[in-house]
């Protein structure tokens, strides 16, 4: 087998790969909380373990830490960047901020669900107040998701410029 040298990746390519991984992890947590699955229905939920909300809270914390590291990487990459990477690298910090807020809100939703499980075990549920609180948490998460999608569109525009620069 011959050893083919792989060209060194541009900083924007590394950052883009990292963003995909962060978003994949966040989306997995989102789906485990909100996506319909037959195992979540009665009586199946009595047999299969349910969503581990505490794990989601920890994962969101890790993603937020990684987002901060990515911001630092973007600052370093801007000094080495080629002109066609500029739009992408300028858009990434706003996207990481939106990802951070979205992770905070998803973490808050997971923590609320975990607290509700604890209250249900100890018979402390006050349904009317708890439903209003949950509704507010979901509304905040929905707003954060909307901001994340809008910031992601700008990142995609910047990434298309990077791809054109690489192919051009």
Where do the model's predicted regions map?
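Cytosolic juxtamembrane helix and N-cap/initiation of the first transmembrane helix
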Residues: 1-31
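Short, charge/polar-rich alpha-helical segments
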Residues: 9-20, 53-57, 86-99
């Amino acid at each position: 087998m011959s050893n083919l040298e792989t060209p060194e990746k541009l900083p924007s390519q590394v950052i883009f790969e990292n963003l995909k991984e962060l978003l994949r992890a966040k989306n997995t947590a989102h789906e485990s909380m909100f996506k319909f699955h037959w195992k979540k229905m009665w009586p199946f939920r009595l047999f299969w373990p349910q969503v581990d909300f505490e794990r989601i809270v920890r994962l969101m914390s890790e993603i937020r830490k990684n987002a901060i590291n990515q911001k630092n990487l973007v600052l370093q990459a801007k000094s080495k960047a080629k002109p066609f990477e500029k739009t992408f690298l300028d858009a990434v910090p706003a996207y990481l901020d939106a990802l951070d807020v979205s992770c905070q809100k998803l973490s808050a939703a997971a923590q609320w669900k975990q607290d509700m499980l604890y209250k249900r075990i100890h018979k402390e549920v006050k349904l009317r107040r708890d439903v209003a609180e949950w509704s507010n948490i979901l509304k905040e998460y929905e707003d954060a998701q909307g901001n994340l999608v809008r910031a992601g569109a700008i990142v995609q525009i910047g990434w298309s410029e990077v791809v054109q620069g690489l192919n051009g």
